[in-house]
Structure formats: structure tokens, C-alpha cells
Amino acid sequence: KEYGNCHFSWITHTPQVVPKDEVHLIYKWNEDNVSRLANQKFDIAINLDKDKEACMLLALVCANKKFGFIWKDGHLNTATDKAEHKLITGIFDHISKKNTLNYLEEIFDICHFDFKGEEYKINLNYSLSDIWRKKLQGISKGKTIIGLNTGCGLRWKTRLWPKEYWVELIKDLQYQGYFCLLMGGSDEDEMNRFYAEETNATYLGTFSLEEFIAIANNTEIIVTPVSMMMHIALALKKQLMLFHNIFNVHEFELYGRGIIIEPTSGCDCYFGNSCDREKSCMHDI
């Protein structure tokens, strides 16, 4: 909208999610591609990631304007003053807890824009999605399909919901006539096989990220902790039930299509990798 006819180059560890019909050049993060981009000229360069390598790349790239986080004088810095708020909230928990902006408002502001409800963009393989639509229609027998994303990655395991609660939820949903589809990546494979055995819920296995997105597109409701699945569900405009505990609840923008479920006892381990309680707060959801 702002710049009219644009040419986009995008580098990421997960190129499968970037919409191919809107981004002209999509690069997988590796040494060759980092070097390639570092030696190109751009009108605008944006980095919204505070990881050292990403900040160093923004410092190396030749661009008339730079937004976001950059590497300067041997440490993380901001490309413009607009990124200072997000940098400070990432360092000081007591300031982060007072933040009332959602993540999209924050990243739009970093880029000197106002967030006005713009929707996510994602790469959806419609052919794969149609194949899975037919398969899932056959095995769900007309029931409403609920995608249950049981894991949360390895970074913050404090977000995991207890196994016995997942089993209880699945059995209750099945009793109400829903079709439960267990979902996750390779880190959740063993756990999802356990749930399938305990409940007879359907588990299809693990897939490439592109195919995972295509399968998720054929659910009507998604239940998940805060994870990549949350972003996929929002991009696919699915109804979402989000388990939340360790982050600032104001960060999340669900576009009026979801609810956030939190522990009734609160959470003491803000952005924590371990819980000091005898019983994790996730037992209180």
C-alpha cells in the first residue's frame, strides 16, 4: 500500500510459510544465501528478530532505510528509535509485564506503520489441501474436525498441558461427537502416538511444514498452546482455543476468532523454562 509496486526478498529458517505468490525471492537461511543478500542493494531492509545472526545480516545489508534490530558496536541495537520499546520489553520483565500492545501492533510500529487489523499471510498449497480435504472427509464421516496441537516446541516446555488433561479433553470431545485430529511435529510424535493409543483419536504422523499447513486448513477448530500452530491457525482463519501461561496475554491478537484459556492460579515463571512450583500452573487449566 505504501510503496506501490514492490519487489520482496525474504530470508528465513522456514521458507515453507512465506506466501510464494506475494514474495518474489524466498531464501532458506544458510551461509550462501546470507552472503548473497549481504552483497545486494535494497531500498528498505527489515529485521524483526533479535537473534545475533539476523541483526548482523541487517548491519551488512546495503539499504537506504533499515528498520528493526541491528548489530552495532559489538552488540544488539535498534535500527530506529521505534524498535526501542520492543528491545526494552525483551530485556526487563517488569516493563514487559506492563506492556498492553499486541505483537502485531509492536512490529508494525517498529516499521513505522499503524496496525489496522491486517490479516496474516501464509503459503497454502491448495492442491495438497484439497487432497487432505477428501481424505479427512472420508475418515471423519461428517463430524466437525478439531485439530489438537499437543506440543509447544522445545524452547519453553513450561507451556505443556498435562497428558492426563489431553486424554480427558479428547474423550470428552469424542463423546460430544467431534472428530479429534492429533497434530504436531517430530518432537511430539511419541506423545501423539500415546494419545492415539489411549483415546483412539486419529493421528496421521509427521509431515513437512507445507503439508502440515495443508492438513490444518481442513480443521474447523484448533486447540493449541502458544506455538507456531497458533500463527498457522490465525493465518488460516480458524477458530482457535489458545492455552496461555508464561507470556503477557496482551501480546496476542486473535482477530475475534478465538479465546485464551489461562491458569486460574496465575503463572510465576514469566518467560521461564522451568517452574518453581511443586505443581505447574498448567495443571490449573
Could you tell me what each predicted segment is?
Residues K1-I285:
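Catalytic machinery of carbohydrate-active enzymes
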